[in-house]
Amino acid sequence: MTADEVQYALTYSQNSPFYFRSHYVVPNVHYGLGFNHELDLLVISPVTFIGTEVEIKVSKGDLKRDLEKKHHHFDFRIRQLYFAGPRTLEGAFHEYAPKEAGIITVIPQVVCGSTRYYCSIRRNAKVNKSFIPFKPKEIEQLLRLGNMRYWSLFGKQFKRKNNGKNDQTNS
């Protein structure tokens, strides 16, 4: 299973706690909001502005390397931290993920010729009781970053599809 598959499962599966139709979800957040590390997924409640970080791991080695990082996934705006990945890593998550982090596993299943992903919270995340909800200006910036990310990706896919033809951008 790839990181993209896990990300898809976490955001597109209606059984996921981070379904994109009910949360603000932006991938790979690093710059623009003052984080000291990159967040694989930043999930924010549109009502309470409470933030959750999701760290995606697809191998035991990747999970072990995370232990060497200095930031330890802490930010005062993050209420909960989850580690997410394939169900086959559940044992490694329990062994190597920080004890305050929740664990979400993903199982792909082929149904009628198409793959569906099922997310399961295997351990609830502990709540950072000193967290501070995001401010409206930060939400605005996050949505701006998500918008920029979408249109950058759209442009790359468009160029790939059209082999660079009809490129009107000269910047």
Describe each model-derived feature in a short phrase.
Residues 16-34:
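A short acidic/basic microdomain associated with nuclease active sites
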